Amino acid sequence: MKDPAHLPLTSRERVRKAIRHEEPDRLPIDLGGMASTGIMAMAYARLKAHLGLTSGEVRVFDMGQQLAEVEAEVLSRFGVDVISLTNSLGEAPELWKPWKLPDGVDCRIPAGIDLRPDEEKGGWTIWENGLPMQRMSPGNLYFSEAIH
């Protein structure tokens, strides 16, 4: 039987030790556990391609920052210790609709987003309550506030 002191820590134990400024068995890994540790959807699509992962799809849960929802296969591949409890809308297809990232890669975005092409200036505009709220100009990678 293995000595419990030499068993690897669980993700929870590892993160708790790090927060308490104690030395864990390795550094905790976070990839998309919260918005500030997220990964841009275009980078995520390229990461999946580099790893040879063809299953699943790129889903953008934060349009402004273009953040991707990191799939379980990628989390597992990197031994990620921190996961998000709030990013996902779920797997149901009716919750997502197709779109293309600025580099042309197919993705899915939340179905409830009122996203319209800007016929005058090019790019895209996100509308809420009849007002243009965020805009992605041609050549840009992110949405910015449309109303200041």
Go through each PLM region and give its residues:
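Catalytic cores of TIM-barrel enzymes
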Residues: M1-H148
